[in-house]
Amino acid sequence: MKHTIYWNEKYTGAEHAFDTTRKSGEIADAIGHEHITDPASNGHVALHNANDEIKKALSADYYEDLKTGGPKSQSNGFAWDYGIWEMALNSTAGVMSATAEAIVNNTVAGSLSSGLHHAHHNNGAGFCTVNGLAVTANWLNSLHVTILDFDAHCGGGTVKMLRHLNIDSRVEQYDISTNYFDEYEEDETHNIRIARSDADYTDAVNETLNKVNPNTNVILYNAGTDPYPTISHETLAEREHTVFQWAKQHNIPIAYVLAGGYTSAQTMDSLVDSHVNTLDAAESIV
């Protein structure tokens, strides 16, 4: 891999074993750790920067509970241990690092982060702990940001958090989902498209990309593979090539994260392969 991919073992350090807390390690093993960059050693973003940005974006009680095991620490659906906080901190640093890398070098970069888009500023939800997408968008200050949320479920936590932080005027979000879980109130630049067949899904991808502000400074791509089995692996792989080629053709930096994808629908090997399709498509534009 020539493009930068961020990950470290803290991404999988939580005691609670679930796809969200484990699959990134399997993906890192599959592509080879020589292709991985540790966000904790990244020159663009230090862990203390990520900590500061998380603290800035979250409510004070949720921030403290995540670090200490307080009442809201299990709102993501996981039993708490300190590894949950370290996972969220390092994963968020990875999203920030990938975004900085993409912007500084006008390229593509990724983080093997997941468990982001349902979390809000004052609680986790739906296996999501800290919304690294919203935290990163907030950190980018005056830049225009486009979030493409192509997960089986809607990214309502992100949109609600953008509105809470009062940055939704410069951060647009477009969802393509297979159901309305975690839907949000839509407007012109924050909207949802539901697609439940391969043909409709492909149309939705092309039509959604045409909505993106051509002057956006960066795309944050939440690249879920959990539309499978409603949507075929082949169509999802085609989606990845379409998204990354579109970003390259429009000269827009793009940073991606893993989003959903679960062994309840397929084997771990199949799940890893489907996520590696995202990495391969990103690599094709370097």
Where are these regions (language model features)?
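N-terminal low-complexity, Ser/Thr- and acidic-residue-enriched intrinsically disordered segments
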Residues: M1-N51
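Glycine-/proline-rich flexible loop or hinge segments
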Residues: E9-A14, H48-D52, P71-I84
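Short, solvent-exposed coil/turn elements at secondary-structure transition points
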Residues: Y11, N42, H48, A60, ...
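Short, glycine/charge-rich beta-strand/loop segments that flank catalytic centers
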Residues: A40-D52, S111-H117, A152
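Charged, often glycine-rich, active-site loop that binds/positions anionic groups
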Residues: G43-P71
